[in-house]
Regions:
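C-terminal motif of bacterial Sec signal peptides marking the signal peptidase cleavage site
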Residues: 15-19
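Extended ligand-binding regions for polar small-molecule ligands
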Residues: 21, 67-76, 153-155, 221-259
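Ligand-binding clefts/hinges and TM-proximal coupling segments of bilobed small-molecule sensing domains
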Residues: 22-28, 159-173, 209-212, 239-266
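Extracytoplasmic small-molecule ligand-binding "clamshell" domains
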Residues: 29-106
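Periplasmic-binding protein-like
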Residues: 49, 125-132, 198-236, 258-266
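Acidic, polar ligand-binding/catalytic clefts
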Residues: 80-143, 209
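Short helix-initiation/N-cap motifs at beta->coil->alpha
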Residues: 83-95, 136, 153-156, 170-184, ...
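A ligand-binding cleft/hinge motif common to bilobed small-molecule-binding domains
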Residues: 107-115, 160-162, 183, 188-217
Length: 266
């Protein structure tokens, strides 16, 4: 008879422990599943802030058309943007080494770059143009022979000028330095993306002009590491949703007003 109290205590303890174990396991499983379902994927995005109005730094904040666009895409696809800045020529190497997942910097889609990184569908139509002082006798690309032309290092303008004989090319990490070289007389022309050249004119620099029209037809794409094809799909899906809803055009108008030259129409 004395054994019964002991057995009863053992049975009660066993039931209590079993109940705690089952309850704890179910709660942990439910909690983990809920967190995973609602968790945002963090994407590391790199930008070159010397490319207004696409990327620029204002009062310590990175802003611009590309920045607004990638944030809008991220919101559509439940992604969280972790922004960092770097020089343009460092963007593709950073993608290749998985230092970053995405790069936005008005990056022209080219076959050479597409071998190294993936590109989203185009989001802006651009081209190169020549910027000179208003009193310059340069009228087009053929007049650049024998002249000094300032370019941004690693850009399509740099590539184009490096293939053109008889041109003295000055390369700069920052396009503002190239513009300063033109203003100071160290270069007779700047070859760069037309929307940025136009933005330079429209922000108080009335002594310069664009000549010769667009030299190339180029499309900008969002660059994505080749290691994450599923991320590329999300970015393309988000971009398509923005275009379908009209939000893409709203962002475009915010920066480019009534100028339709760069607008991608679907």
């Amino acid at each position: 008879l004395r054994k019964w109290p002991v057995l009863i205590v053992v049975l009660i303890m066993g039931l209590v422990l079993a109940g705690c174990g089952n309850s704890g396991g179910k709660t942990a499983g439910t909690s983990t599943g809920g967190n995973e379902a609602g968790k945002q994927e963090v994407i590391k995005v790199a930008a070159d802030t010397t490319f207004p109005p696409f990327e620029m730094e204002v009062n310590g904040k990175v802003t611009g058309f590309d920045i607004d666009l990638i944030n809008a895409i991220a919101a559509k696809e439940n992604l969280k943007v972790q922004m960092q800045t770097m020089d343009f020529q460092g963007l593709i190497p950073a993608l290749q080494t998985d230092t970053v997942d995405v790069a936005v910097a008005g990056i022209t889609i080219t076959p050479q770059r597409a071998q190294m990184v993936n590109f989203s569908n185009p989001y802006y139509h651009s081209g190169l143009s020549i910027l000179v002082k208003k009193d310059s006798n340069i009228k087009g690309v053929s007049d650049l022979k024998g002249k000094t032309v300032a370019v941004k290092l690693g850009t399509t303008g740099d590539i184009m000028m490096s293939k053109m004989p008889g041109v003295n090319v000055k390369r700069f990490n920052n396009i503002d330095d190239a513009y300063n070289e033109l203003q100071n007389g160290g270069a007779q022309a700047v070859l760069f993306d037309n929307p940025v050249n136009q933005n330079y004119i429209n922000t108080g620099h009335n002594n310069v002009k664009v000549v010769g029209g667009l030299l190339t037809g180029e499309d900008y794409g969002i660059a994505v590491t080749k290691q994450k094809p599923e991320l590329l799909k999300k970015i393309n899906d988000g971009l398509a949703r923005l275009m379908a809803s009209g939000e893409y055009e709203q962002l475009y108008r915010k920066y480019f007003k009534s100028d339709d030259s760069g607008l991608i129409k679907k």
